[in-house]
């Protein structure tokens, strides 16, 4: 019985140690929000969304990608309808690889003519 308790304590301690290592990984979020021009068609906006999603498979330094439509009831969105969150392991990945990557440059050229307003916020994840 004494050995079983010792084994459980050791297993629990190892599990907590592994959990702490996971949460200590530094991550950076790149949040991009768009207000599209009224003249942009639904088809154009849908193509832009698909192109942004495709960056995840084209740029290996993107660790995670999420997006969604504004559903806030607060009416403080200033016309912003789309929000995208891109996760990087480092600022070097974001600034040195992603920003100048040909797929990202192509995406910016695609979206540019359709956007009335862009808001970008980057932050280091604090747990």
PLM region descriptions:
Residues 12, 24, 116-119:
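Generic structural motif recognizing short loop/turn segments at the entrances and edges of beta-strands
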Residues 12, 58-61, 114:
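Short, structurally constrained coil/turn elements
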Residues 3, 17-81, 89-96, 123-127:
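Short S/T/G/P-rich N-terminal loop/turn motif that feeds into the first structured element of a domain
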Residues 14-15, 100:
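Generic detector of short, well-ordered, non-transmembrane alpha-helical segments enriched
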Residues 4-12:
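Sec-dependent N-terminal signal peptides
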Residues 83-127:
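Surface-exposed, polar helix/loop patches in the mature regions of secreted/periplasmic/lumenal proteins
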Residues 12, 34, 108:
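Alpha-helical and His/Cys-centered functional microenvironments
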């Amino acid at each position: 019985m004494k050995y079983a308790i010792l084994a459980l304590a050791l297993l629990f301690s190892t599990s907590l140690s592994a959990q702490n290592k996971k949460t200590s990984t530094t991550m950076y979020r790149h949040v991009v929000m768009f207000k599209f021009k009224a003249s942009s068609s639904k088809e154009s906006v849908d193509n832009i969304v698909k192109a942004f999603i495709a960056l995840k498979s084209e740029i290996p330094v993107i660790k995670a990608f999420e997006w969604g439509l504004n559903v806030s009831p607060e009416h403080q969105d200033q016309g912003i309808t789309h929000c995208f969150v891109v996760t990087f392991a480092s600022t070097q990945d974001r600034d040195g690889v992603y920003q100048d990557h040909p797929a990202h440059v192509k995406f910016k050229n695609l979206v540019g003519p359709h956007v009335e307003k862009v808001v970008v916020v980057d932050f280091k994840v604090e747990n």
